[in-house]
Amino acid sequence: MTVDHSKIPSITPSPLDGAPALEPLVSRCRIVDFPKIEDARGNLTFIEGDRHVDFGIKRVYYLYDVPGGAERGGHAHKGLHQLLIAMSGSFDVVVDDGRHRQRFHLNRSYYGLYIPPMIWREIDNFSSGSVCMVLASEYYDESDYYRDQDEFKAAAGA
């Protein structure tokens, strides 16, 4: 098993006063590439928990038939790790740690977006026919959710 170094905040100099500053939590969100086996008969990509992602996979679900202009997400998790993959089509994911925001465009099935705990996420700009598959580190638990953004920001110290 590998050590997940993304869980350890980096110390970087502050551009304002020269004092050390913690790296924004949103920078822990990252694109993860998966193996891609190309063949004349079609391509194959696979994902293994604790190997390609830094967590065991306990739950898989997917979003599909999302109406044009609709948004999904709109929450954060207290302890859950997730990986979002565009299995078909494309969509955008906006991640927010309470202070910093970043937008990712997902449109390939051989890479995904890792989202650690305590990151607010919003998913929008779904193309027609898009499918978003989500790999999760835990079983569903409603108590793990922040569904109110102000409550999330207070918990995140923003």
Question: What positions do the PLM features span?
Answer:
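Well-ordered alpha/beta subsegment
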Residues: 108-113, 118-125
